[in-house]
Amino acid sequence: MPLIELCNIRKRYPAGDQDVEVLHGIDLSIEAGEFLAIMGSSGSGKSTLMHILGCLDQPSDGEYRFSGQPVTAMDHDQLAWLRREMFGFVFQSYHLIGTASAWENVALPAIYAGVPREERKQRAQQLLTDLGLEDRLENRPSQLSGGQQQRVSIARALMNGGKVILADEPTGALDSASGEAVMDQLRSLAEQGHTVIVITHDAKVAAHADRVVEIHDGNLISDTRHHDHLHERAKPVSAPPKESVMPDPGEVMEAVVMALRSLRANWMRTLLTLLGIVIGVGAVVVMLAIGEGAKQDVVAQINERGTNLLVVRPDRGMQRVADGVIATLVPADAQALESLPNISIAVPEISGNVTARANGMDISTSVQAVSEDFPSLRDWQPVQGIFFGEEDLKSYSPVAVIGQTVKENLFPEGDPLGQFLLLDSIPFQVIGVMSAQGASDRGEDQDDVVIVPLSTGTLRLFGQNYLNSITVAVDDVTQIDATEAAAVALLTQRHGKQDVRVFNMASLLEMVSETQNTLTALLGSIAAISLLVGGIGVMNIMLVSVTERIHEIGIRMATGARQRNILQQFLTESVVVSALGGIVGVVIGVLVGWLLMLFGMAIVFSVPVMVVSFVCAAGIGLLFGFAPALKAARLNPVEALSND
């Protein structure tokens, strides 16, 4: 049974509205171990015939059998298996990858055969040594002469065994001495049992072969044998197997290595591609950190006031007394509210602004007249002295507890305890200093305050008994809504109408949290758009990369790369560059966040956000890299090789 059998092979190419046929019914049989030359002038169809023989192209009509197996019925992976395991190509233009060393070019077919890196490196170096290139192992093609490059090409053809060597004008770009050396090497391979097929226009080159087939205008016109016997060591061949669609882990790692090499070779383009992803990921990290910081800041301030609180205020539409206070709430209402189930404390409050004077200094500050339960309600205790008690309220004691700001302004050097200050010319004795609170959620200084007993304030400072608010603490927060309804009902009954409004701090916290979550989502969406734009940039750059590397893709396909290998390689490059951008983006986002923290902005980083941002960056590389990678994988090997 012939190793190669062509029956009525025709090949047509589209030319406008018509097809041009370049091979006209070729019939050819080649036995294993033959040294055959296919000779013809330029345009005779000999290169097209070689492409069909080497499974780089498919015939338009006819039947091609390899080792009895119908090649025309094989799928892409089986054709790649034949190119990888059976054929070895020696091209006139060498077709070496410019960014790879000599041994790496030779080892290329073994990558797609799944040979471990060290094993293929040793074999590649041994092949080059056998061909006299032991001192050129690390040289790139640009550092080699034409003859040396052709020997690298021969070594590559032998990397996986090269049972069939297809040499297309192997001496065409060489001087006579180098050309003769190459033909001697091909003769030696034939003597070792390889099937050698040389494509040439030169009769002197064809004379080295045992059999010469001449082609003219797409027709075989002669078939001459110089020797009638085959070499005794002709190598047996097998049919291509069905291959697994699952990639080998070694293939993935090799794809990563090749991706890093390719990205390093075009570092400026890689940097520009990274920039879009870096900006997108960094923006996501910073924006969400700002949003989360703002949310937690507001929530913390609400929590400081207590989420178990109900604040009862007069309805703004109610009647006002002469000084503008709404005449609705009175201290007795607070006592009534304390009688309700689930209410532990009810603190009445009157507040206003006064001029405070002490030690010859005047300041404008706020004053709060409250009951003795105020520190417990607000979880705000004195750090010096004491807070007034029930007896002080009963006796209308002229005592005061001051905030830290008032202390610093009126008593900058001395101990304020026991000293007097005037509030609108009314003397009060300082009995305590509250702990520092800082600014409120509205930016107000909570330490710029003087706190006095409610009874004293109503009598001596405000001259009226109507309250600004009553703050209620509930025992069971899960029942806070029911307690709120009960409070409104009680006060409506007492006043004969509904003239109050109740502010639920738990509901306020929930509302603020939802608002902040919406704001954070908005900020994240804006940042995600930047990441999306970065992904489009990745796709554009990868499309450019595919266009620039069509020739390299052709070389890889000729040496046995499957479509999935090409797809995997370009997808890996896209994912690697996006993942690198994701890592750098996270780092830069954290650095920018820390910088903003130095300026007092509330920033809260989230590790899950960083992880998700990185994963999204890699996912964007996968998503936007798929179209360019698919384009590369679907290239025709012959067309890709001719794109130089």
From Swiss-Prot:
GO terms under cellular component: plasma membrane
Domain ABC transporter: from-to ranges: 4-242
Enzyme Commission identifier(s): 7.6.2.-
Superkingdom field: Bacteria
GO molecular function: ATP binding; ATP hydrolysis activity; transmembrane transporter activity
Keywords, sorted A to Z: Antibiotic resistance, ATP-binding, Cell inner membrane, Cell membrane, Membrane, Nucleotide-binding, Translocase, Transmembrane, Transmembrane helix, Transport
Principal cellular location given in the protein's record: membrane
Record's keyword annotation contains Amino-acid biosynthesis: no
Membrane topology: Multi-pass membrane protein
Record GO biological process: response to antibiotic
Keyword DNA-binding: no
Pfam families cross-referenced by the UniProt entry: ABC_tran, FtsX, MacB_PCD
Binding, ATP: G40, S41, S42, G43, S44, G45, K46, S47
Transmembrane annotation, as ranges: 271-291, 526-546, 583-603, 607-627
Compartment(s): Cell inner membrane
Binding partners and assembly: Homodimer. Part of the tripartite efflux system MacAB-TolC, which is composed of an inner membrane transporter, MacB, a periplasmic membrane fusion protein, MacA, and an outer membrane component, TolC. The complex forms a large protein conduit and can translocate molecules across both the inner and outer membranes. Interacts with MacA.
Family: Belongs to the ABC transporter superfamily. Macrolide exporter (TC 3.A.1.122) family.
Biological role: Part of the tripartite efflux system MacAB-TolC. MacB is a non-canonical ABC transporter that contains transmembrane domains (TMD), which form a pore in the inner membrane, and an ATP-binding domain (NBD), which is responsible for energy generation. Confers resistance against macrolides.
Name listed for the protein in its UniProt record: Macrolide export ATP-binding/permease protein MacB
Gene of this entry: macB
